[in-house]
Amino acid sequence: MPFYLFLRRLRRSPAAVCGLIGLALLVFIALFAPWLAPVDPNWQDAAARLEAPGARHWLGTDSYGRDLLSRLIYGTRPALGLVALVTVITLPAGLLVGILSGYYGGWVERILMRFTDVVMSMPRLILAFAFVAMLGPGLVNGALALALTTWPAYARQARSEIQRLRHSDYLAAAEMMGIRGLRLLVGHILPLCLPSAIVRLALDLAGIILAAAGLGFLGLGARPPMAEWGAMIADGMQVIFDQWWIAAIPGGAILFASLAFNLLGDGLRDVLEPQHD
């Protein structure tokens, strides 16, 4: 699809436009966090512990006296950073396994797909938590754990598409022109798999945000004292009946990010896969 046509269809999709606006807002906040945050997110004020939202602290403070607005702003960085790392690992790995197994078939397909089935047979979140428990807490380890449990779905999707197109006239014509091997896989087969993979990724990112928050909630995400939405909810759970806003505010941020990715995924599906309309 030409890029200008893609942009035209994207502008006509309200869901995609809303999702892009929400994602752009999150990226803007993450990039300019030092200028947007009113104070240092790790600065502790013992005299202002568990302070309610007010003129001094717009969203209140946590149990250590840290400004919640500043920590909420800085929390976008590990959230989007983890999403970016998972995307960089998951999409190439899943497409590589799926394209190789679908195109070559035979023993290559059997080995790759059996390994894929083994990974898919395990509960995704439990497997991710187990990986992080073995590797240790941290942003990179969390991204690796989530990526290792996410790529099989992309591999199976790419494999099914390649099997459907393997004997098409399009690929037969390319092979008759002498286009084979890596050139065929990258130049002709990969572009056929990308649209559906991008749509699936956009829809999966909402779940990845929730899984990342779950890791932070259990203390397996970003290392303290780095601001992280899941860890902020865990801190707020201890005083949720009296100072409910400490957990509700980062929960609202997670909801906003998930909604933005879901809307973007729905819009991209309408644009890149019109047969779903």
Protein language model regions, located:
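Transmembrane alpha-helix signature in integral membrane proteins
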Residues: 68-103
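Hydrophobic alpha-helical transmembrane segments of membrane transport/permease proteins
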Residues: 6, 21, 25, 29-64, ...
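Glycine-rich helix-loop "coupling/hinge" segments at transmembrane-helix boundaries
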Residues: 131-134, 146, 161-162, 211-253, ...
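Transmembrane alpha-helical segments of polytopic membrane transport and secretion proteins
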Residues: 1-24, 263-277
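Membrane-water interface segments at the C-terminal ends of transmembrane alpha-helices
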Residues: 20-40, 75, 114-138, 147, ...
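Generic hydrophobic transmembrane alpha-helix motif, especially the helices
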Residues: 58, 62, 68, 92, ...
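C-terminal transmembrane helix and the adjacent membrane-cytosol boundary/short C-terminal tail
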Residues: 149, 195-203, 244-277
